[in-house]
């Protein structure tokens, strides 16, 4: 039989905090808690973004929602949907294999639990254009990726098939124009 010391309530006041450094196994090992995510996201890139979005993530948001990934890029080569799948995968961010046409991506993603709104937040956010919006195809819409968010709120995107099948190009949208679009975050 083992005997374990009894803890007094006064012992419980010396609790671990989330500030400073923790000493690990040996004196030369430290862990800076400022470099540790506070998110419960399994995807480390999503965890980092959630830390940056602390205070604005929707209540009840589950970062470990179903992603819709099902066997890789199922979109036709060179289409806008193909590019966005490729680029999000390169960035280590979740993306679904069967979100449909560009104009369907916000609803498809929202239905799986992704955070979707009208605010560009991060490089890697998916940008959804409705049919005819900013010269998007009137039937299929369009989808692109944020590559840069400028200090004035304007965004720079990369896209495919705006200048020809498989042609990767870029455009810049003012903050006012960007606010008219939908953004799929994570």
Residue ranges and their predicted role:
Residues 4, 93-102, 167-173:
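Short, exposed beta-strand "edge-strand" segments with a Pro/Gly-rich flavor and a Y/T-containing core
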Residues 41-143, 148, 159:
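Secreted/periplasmic proteins that engage bacterial cell-wall peptidoglycan
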């Amino acid at each position: 039989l083992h005997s374990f010391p009894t803890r007094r309530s006064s012992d419980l006041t010396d609790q671990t905090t989330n500030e400073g450094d923790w000493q690990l196994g040996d004196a030369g090992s430290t862990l800076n808690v400022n470099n540790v995510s506070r998110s419960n996201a399994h995807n480390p890139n999503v965890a980092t973004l959630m830390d940056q979005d602390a205070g604005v993530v929707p209540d009840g948001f589950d970062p470990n929602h179903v992603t819709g990934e099902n066997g890789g890029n199922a979109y036709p080569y060179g289409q806008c949907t193909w590019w966005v799948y490729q680029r999000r995968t390169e960035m280590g961010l979740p993306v679904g294999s069967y979100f449909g046409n560009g104009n369907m991506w916000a609803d498809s993603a929202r239905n799986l639990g992704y955070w979707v709104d009208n605010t560009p937040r991060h490089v890697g956010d998916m940008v959804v254009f409705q049919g005819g919006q900013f010269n998007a195809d009137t039937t299929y819409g369009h989808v692109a990726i944020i590559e840069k968010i400028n200090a004035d709120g304007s965004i720079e995107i990369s896209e495919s098939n705006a200048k020809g099948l498989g042609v990767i190009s870029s455009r810049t949208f003012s903050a006012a124009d960007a606010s008219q679009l939908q953004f799929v975050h994570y």
